[in-house]
Amino acid sequence: MLFDVFQQYPAAMPVLATVGGLIIGSFLNVVIWRYPIMLRQQMAEFHGEMPSVQSKISLALPRSHCPHCQQTIRIRDNIPLLSWLMLKGRCRDCQAKISKRYPLVELLTALAFLLASLVWPESGWALAVMILSAWLIAASVIDLDHQWLPDVFTQGVLWTGLIAAWAQQSPLTLQDAVTGVLVGFIAFYSLRWIAGIVLRKEALGMGDVLLFAALGSWVGPLSLPNVALIASCCGLIYAVITKRGTTTLPFGPCLSLGGIATIYLQALF
């Protein structure tokens, strides 16, 4: 029935996808900020350090607030993208600057959802790619902040890809998706092991290995070299622009871009 509506009103799906992307992007900002804190609290509890009830946070509580003045953000000031523009990037109460990251994450998510709806109209694969985009955006920003890819995001990428293949919404068969995961894991784990011996230091984090393997469920074994090539080029460009030299490079965003780019290249060519 829903697809019948989209057929009758072809502009409806891109509009809904864009609005949905803005809303999901707003939620991703919460996840990006709070999830690492939640894990640190869990680790503290594991070691016997009990945080106070007031300081303990979840994805739902406490309500979003300004990190500078601690004032709870009003509903009218929490509209994705629009509120940041209307407030000119400042807190209504203390006038402290609001990071540009918040509208950028919301805008990027909206654009990712819009693009998927345009490339795969009236398709379950479009929804799957939207979900993938959300996983990758959150994982990439956390990796940029903390140089760490949480397992929950790489597992989300993995299971979403496998479920899409199982439900026959993916261009891949379930067998190809599983093979892609196995080949991706073996290839990148071997590369990690060899690079560790040659360089005598960890060249790839285990999170990078797991993310590459998870992307195999989306692109299949034959397209994994494309993911690695695009990711390597992105990593090189990022290192040159930021002048990081031999310092640790967060590779998750590069792999994410390589995976998404490969999925769209498969669709277009």
Swiss-Prot record:
Q: Which Pfam families match?
A: A24_N_bact (PF06750), Peptidase_A24 (PF01478)
Keywords (alphabetical) are: Cell inner membrane, Cell membrane, Hydrolase, Membrane, Methyltransferase, Multifunctional enzyme, Protease, Transferase, Transmembrane, Transmembrane helix
Methyltransferase: present as a keyword of the record? yes
> Which cysteine pairs make disulfide bonds?
none
| Record localization | Cell inner membrane
Example of a GO MF term: methyltransferase activity
Q: Name one GO cellular component term.
A: plasma membrane
For the keyword Cell inner membrane, the answer is: yes
What's one GO BP annotation on this UniProt entry? Answer: signal peptide processing
Regions crossing the membrane = 13-33, 102-122, 124-144, 147-167, 178-198, 210-230, 249-269
Describe the outcome of a gene knockout: No effect on assembly of T2SS-beta, severely reduced secretion of the labile toxin exported by T2SS-beta.
User: Of which family is this protein a member?
Assistant: Belongs to the peptidase A24 family.
Anything else known = Encoded in a type II secretion system (T2SS-beta); this strain encodes 2 T2SS but only this one (beta) is expressed under standard laboratory conditions.
The record, for PANTHER family, names: PREPILIN LEADER PEPTIDASE_N-METHYLTRANSFERASE-RELATED (PTHR30487:SF0), TYPE 4 PREPILIN-LIKE PROTEINS LEADER PEPTIDE-PROCESSING ENZYME (PTHR30487)
Q: What's the protein here called?
A: Type 4 prepilin-like proteins leader peptide-processing enzyme
Origin organism of this chain?
A: Escherichia coli O78:H11 (strain H10407 / ETEC)
